[in-house]
Amino acid sequence: MGKIIGIDLGTTNSCVAVLDGGKARVIENAEGDRTTPSIIAYTDDEIIVGQPAKRQAVTNPTNTFFAIKRLIGRRFKDDEVQRDVNIMPFKIIGADNGDAWVESRGNKMAPPQVSAEILKKMKKTAEDFLGEEVTEAVITVPAYFNDSQRQATKDAGRIAGLDVKRIINEPTAAALAYGIDKKQGDNIVAVYDLGGGTFDISIIEIDSNDGDQTFEVLATNGDTHLGGEDFDNRMINYLADEFKKDQGLDLRRDPLAMQRLKEAAEKAKIELSSTNHTEVNLPYITADASGPKHLVVKITRAKLESLVEDLIQRTLEPLKVALADADLSISDINEVILVGGQTRMPKVQEAVTNFFGKEPRKDVNPDEAVAVGAAIQAGVLSGEVKDVLLLDVTPLSLGIETMGSVMTKLIEKNTTIPTKAQQVFSTADDNQSAVTIHVLQGERKQASANKSLGQFNLEGIEPAPRGQPQVEVMFDIDADGILHVSATDKKTGKKQNITIKASSGLSDEEVEQMVRDAEAHADEDAKFEELVQARNQADGLAHSTKKQVEEAGDALASDEKEKIEAAIATLETAIKGKDKEAIDTATQALIEASAKLMEIAQAKAQGEAEGQAHDAGQEKPADDVVDAEFEEVKDDKK
């Protein structure tokens, strides 16, 4: 059985870990980094992921996608999406089904399709480390993700060629990473998770007793559209406003300038966590009729804190709600864990310390803890980790729309999962032969104010006066937090089942098509990699052969020289094309054409070696320098 890997699919950065000798290990990617920027770029002939994609973003802003997680499982008309439409350098569009999609070079793509490229990079990173194929994964999501967002994340895994064995909440994963080595006692832990695009708070009880550990989530709350990207956007808007005041030009209309501004804002924000002031200096940021313009703005930590103060305050209300839902007071919290890169900001740490009345722990890596926890959960599923029980919850209430456009809840928020619930409903009209089951997720009484997860009809109900037919609706939430619904006419036994997909979302056919596309791209990518290797080898051969021709001088006959130069020219032409076979053929032709060169080079090397040996024999040096002179002869031979 192959390894199950743990993946933290983050808004800003992603991370992959695996159990290695019973311990979770974060795996370095091909660039040698332990985290990978969640950035995907589409060029003419390839898809670039991670740090290489980030490096080229300034020159390719409209085809470089970041923070895609903020769009996953969302509708285009959502207020949060509309805010992003106005500030992102790439194009966010409404799909035919109403979902938020993106567009690159005329191709429309669903967020799970784009996110799958990051998951593929994580999969390849793990495979390179393990030396074997990886097909199974545990993927983390924000605790406050709704059903649509969880389903979309599983879809991304399928498109990437992964069987997603479990979806696990990020704060729960962080608690696993923190608590797995705490062998005794009962601890109540608050996990404050402020990442790149989402915020979660989870109250978790860790019970360690005689080697058995139970991680029970007591309550969770959060905001799926609040994170480091919003902090960056405040800084971006401030810099753009300052530039407009100074120069009268609005940088928001220039995607290239906005991409440079984004990078500078993120860098300045990070610097201000360890220093009190910094300067953003972007020469040639734009130009007008009078010439090029430069942006130079000094910014202090105090200014940044004033720009984001309300964002930090927005994280505190969910803390109060989560404590109330868990029926706990602040004094009941034993430890506070910070997760997510944005928690490195001193003002965030100060706000959390003031709220809980205690310093957060510093021994949890905010960038890696979630992936480590996912790897531990993977170990639990594979049987490698024993005596660990994880009890997670559903973050939002689930129910159906009933008469008067009211949401009737079947499963309350913070219910431990997996779970089932059923309730009997009846008809609203006389002789009604069908009922529509409209499934909702949220906390509002008014049905329309909640998230619609989908609807289906139960038909064939026998005509009867209103209120007499009995329809049993059953909700079943699996361990991934994904909902399955059935409705049964108790008299006839007729039943209708669905696994809830959002009223939008991707159909199975669309996901399968994307899986096939991804597999086709994998072949394309492999061929492209082979082409690049062939080009590089050929280029190196052409360069070294030219040098050898020069060094050979008159020792090389003119007809031989012409033959070699013609072969070099043919190879250089082939390198510019995209035909690997043509490059390989031209490479072999040059190797054969330059056989005479090799003879000349070998003869020259042999002559030099004999000359040096003769010189060494003529001169009898002292014993203590013989070894050094012998070394010199060897080096020359090389």
UniProtKB/Swiss-Prot annotation:
Taken from the record, one Pfam family name reads HSP70
The record, for PROSITE patterns, names: HSP70_1, HSP70_2, HSP70_3
* Record-linked InterPro entries: ATPase_NBD, Chaperone_DnaK, Heat_shock_70_CS, HSP70_C_sf, HSP70_peptide-bd_sf, Hsp_70_fam
Entry keywords, A to Z: ATP-binding, Chaperone, Nucleotide-binding, Phosphoprotein, Stress response
Locations of Acidic residues compositional bias? 624-638
Q: Which HAMAP family match?
A: DnaK
Q: What does this protein do?
A: Acts as a chaperone.
Q: What is this protein called?
A: Chaperone protein DnaK
The organism is: Shewanella frigidimarina (strain NCIMB 400)
Question: What gene does this protein come from?
Answer: dnaK
